């Protein structure tokens, strides 16, 4: 490989579980581009030094994952509208010697939902979002942008209220125990919690309460099909698996470093699915 070929990364702590190297190196190979993408483990106390010295380390940019996204936002010289709105960065790049940051999570969510459930926006009812972490914030922003009324529920209500306040109280916050009533009129259900992930407790929800035309999106992709998605499919509901968001948020980031917008193909999806299945 050419010594000057661009190098990009995904940084987190821990990071061994990341599928991002599979995704980006697949695109580099398929597009015939010189470059390399690698996982880098950086502990929180060392992150600022890492991010502020990317060029010296030979990187053109990279992805940022837990627990560094909010810290990254505070370190960039320039941030996109999406990053400023979410106060978190998942994509870094160097431009004219300055560190830039973006957040592609909202875009990734919408692309995945549009792909899996075309026409979902026309379904009446509110979007019920479960959880109050960084992913929930990005998804609430995306749904507001599409003109959707959002109902937000989290096991710790105060965290959901903090997200609602961030968006000018646009999402309506409800107690977790009130979810059954909210599901009865929901057009979209999105799980952003870790419930249902391998090694975590299940998400105890009755999808039979949802209207027959509702769509269910679970951002958990380990396992590829959660119990929530299986139950929704069994009822005949349309579902959007979590892997789609992971793949689609990666595409605009790749374009920042390698100047080409890649496509999310069935072949790429199968490649990542196979890697996840091996780890289950």
Swiss-Prot record:
Q: Which CDD domains match?
A: NAD_bind_Shikimate_DH
What molecular functions are annotated in GO for this chain?
NADP binding; shikimate 3-dehydrogenase (NADP+) activity
- Kind of enzyme, top EC level? oxidoreductase
List the active site: 69 (proton acceptor)
Q: What Enzyme Commission number does this protein have?
A: 1.1.1.25
Keyword Methyltransferase (UniProt): no
Top-level lineage group = Bacteria
Give the reactions, separated by semicolons, that this protein catalyses: shikimate + NADP(+) = 3-dehydroshikimate + NADPH + H(+)
Gene Ontology cellular-component annotations? cytosol
**Its Gene Ontology biological processes?**
amino acid biosynthetic process; aromatic amino acid family biosynthetic process; chorismate biosynthetic process; shikimate metabolic process
Pathway-wise, it operates in: Metabolic intermediate biosynthesis; chorismate biosynthesis; chorismate from D-erythrose 4-phosphate and phosphoenolpyruvate: step 4/7
Q: Which InterPro entries match?
A: Aminoacid_DH-like_N_sf, NAD(P)-bd_dom_sf, Shikimate_DH, Shikimate_DH-bd_N, Shikimate_DH_fam, Shikm_DH/Glu-tRNA_Rdtase
In this chain, shikimate is annotated as bound at 18-20, 65, 90, 105, 221
Q: Which UniProt keyword terms apply here?
A: Amino-acid biosynthesis, Aromatic amino acid biosynthesis, NADP, Oxidoreductase
Q: Which HAMAP family match?
A: Shikimate_DH_AroE
- Hey, which family's this protein in? Belongs to the shikimate dehydrogenase family.
- Which proteins does it associate with, and in what oligomeric form? Homodimer.
User: What the protein does?
Assistant: Involved in the biosynthesis of the chorismate, which leads to the biosynthesis of aromatic amino acids. Catalyzes the reversible NADPH linked reduction of 3-dehydroshikimate (DHSA) to yield shikimate (SA).
What is the protein's name according to its record?
Shikimate dehydrogenase (NADP(+))
Organism, scientific name? Methylocella silvestris (strain DSM 15510 / CIP 108128 / LMG 27833 / NCIMB 13906 / BL2)
